[in-house]
Structure formats: C-alpha cells, structure tokens
Amino acid sequence: MPLLHMIGITSSGLTFSIGFCFLPGETQQDFAWGFRCFQEYSISPKVIIIDGDQAQKNAIEEVFPNTPTLLCIWHVNQCVLSNCKALVGQEDWESFQAAWRTVIQARTALEFDDNWGKFQAKYANPKTQQCVTYLQKEWLKLGQKERLVKA
C-alpha cells in the first residue's frame, strides 16, 4: 500500500511530519481521498512539492486548486538516472550529471538558458540526443523548469 506522507518545512529549513495515511492505490481518486483526509483537519498547504506523478498533480488541482505545485529535484534526478544512464554510458555519466546540475541549479533565467544551450551543444550527438530530448519534453517543457526545487 502506498504511503502519503505530508511534510512541513519551517522557515529555518527544518522538516516535520504533518501527517500520513496509507492509500489503496496511486490513482487520482486515491490521492484525492488522501488529500481530503488532510483537508478535514484544516490543513491547507501554501505549496506542495511532488515527484512529477500526473495522478498526484491532478488530485492536488482537484482538492487544493489554489495551491501551487513544485517538482522535487531529487525525484526528477531519479527519473533522469533511470532514463538516461544506460544511453550516456558509465564512463560519461558523472560528466553528464554535472552538466545537468549546472542547468537545473541556475539562479537566473539567463544563466539557465546559457547552461541549457551549452548542455544541448555538448550532448548533441547520436549517443545522447535521446536524453536531451527526454529532458526537454519531460522536465523542461514550458512552465515546468520554473517548478524544479530542491526539497
């Protein structure tokens, strides 16, 4: 059974458990039920950080329509690992990860665009182009790149 764990973060960066519940599955309905359980206790988050799961995102929009969602970079990086490491190859993986980190850790839009352009140029070869396309379609699509956060 999946566990829905709501965590809060203090202004000093400390985390604490707000609550948790077991879900019958991982569908939009399951997540919506879990979020409504929290809502019954007047838990109204200012922002929700998710792993990118569409069912979760849809449930948040249903239950907490005015709450913005952000993407957890750790989970994004796990997806990048599972989708790109075999294509990039073990010998180039560390370099690929370092270049990807410079993209996602950019502090300004200008720095991001510059780093992304360098990344695309460096990995515009038959071996890694599929990874570049994956990153662009899955994680850097319009409006998505601004939602990547370290949590």
Locate predicted features.
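Short conserved beta-strand segments at catalytic cores or DNA/RNA-binding microdomains
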Residues: P2-L14, L23
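Secondary-structure transition/capping motifs at alpha-helix termini
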Residues: I9-L14, F38-P45, V63-T67
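Short Cys/His-based metal-binding microdomains
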Residues: G13-S17, H75
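Active-site beta-loop-alpha junctions of metal-dependent nucleic acid enzymes
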Residues: F20-Y41
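Extended amphipathic alpha-helical interaction segments
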Residues: S44-A151
